[in-house]
Amino acid sequence: MEMNSPHEKAVQAIRYGHSCAMRLKRRLNHPMADGGPLSSYDLAKSIVESFSNAISILSAKPETEDDQFSDLSSRDSSPPPQGSPSKKRKIDSTNSSENWRDDSPDPIYYDGYLWRKYGQKSIKKSNHQRSYYRCSYNKDHNCEARKHEQKIKDNPPVYRTTYFGHHTCKTEHNLDAIFIAGQDPLDDFKSTQMIRFGKDQDQEKESRSNGFSLSVKHEEDIIKEQAIDQYREITSNDQDCQDVIEEYLSSPSGSYPPSSSSGSESADFNSDLLFDNPDSWDRYDQFYF
């Protein structure tokens, strides 16, 4: 297919819009990163213009058969250079024709296609090497698409990606690359969760429930100890009240020991002694054991 045909021009415009959309996506995912030479508004405007140009090209009146025949005749009439086969000249012409290029503040790792690096070399008057890539399906499907990547500016950083030719491999072969390009590694990391099933899930719920119960009981014990300390301070001069507190603390369940027939002091103790003075009732009623 002729590189300057309307169809190829439309493809170039769509690819450029796709590149701008990917850059805008990265900027929206990382708003604090360096904005680069183009603002978000400029990127959005470029996306709209590229798709508008593609639609305009595809909607234009196609060439007539006479125009196509005339174009083919003019190309065929030019003699090939000596010592160079026509097939080799056709491949070289395709490879030397710059399809389109993209300058971005970050390297374009995912552009919707799978690439394989086959070379790298230093460039004159440049501090950064240039990397060379070809389509991963170059041998399997005879896809001649290639690209070059190089950092052309340091401050602010600018990476130039130059594409040559167009992909002739099937679209479904690049679904993995498109799927990866549509995801953000940070989003994948944030969305990672562990799912538990069966006994593991029941054990996790039981562990959380037991931990909560122990925490509540610990808080109740602290409050109870604080109340007893305050009660001791108030009743420090009342020996009978002190004896009641000691009996309460020495009981296994935190309650008063039961009466016994042995005639112990706890059985003979008269609880009315605690309230022989009505003026002190307010002091005792504020404590609950």
UniProtKB/Swiss-Prot annotation:
Keywords noted in UniProt: DNA-binding, Nucleus, Transcription, Transcription regulation
Enumerate composition-biased segments (Low complexity).
Answer: 249-266
Q: Which SMART domains match?
A: WRKY
One of this protein's GO BP terms? salicylic acid mediated signaling pathway
- Stretches for region Disordered: 62-103, 249-278
Q: Where's the DNA-binding part?
A: 104-172
- One GO MF term attached to the UniProt entry: DNA-binding transcription factor activity
Q: Where in the cell is it found?
A: Nucleus
Known role? Transcription factor. Interacts specifically with the W box (5'-(T)TGAC[CT]-3'), a frequently occurring elicitor-responsive cis-acting element.
Protein family per UniProt: Belongs to the WRKY group III family.
Q: What is this protein called?
A: Probable WRKY transcription factor 38
**Species for this entry:** Arabidopsis thaliana
Q: What broad taxonomic lineage does this protein's source fall under?
A: Eukaryota, Viridiplantae, Streptophyta, Embryophyta, Tracheophyta
* Gene that specifies this protein: WRKY38
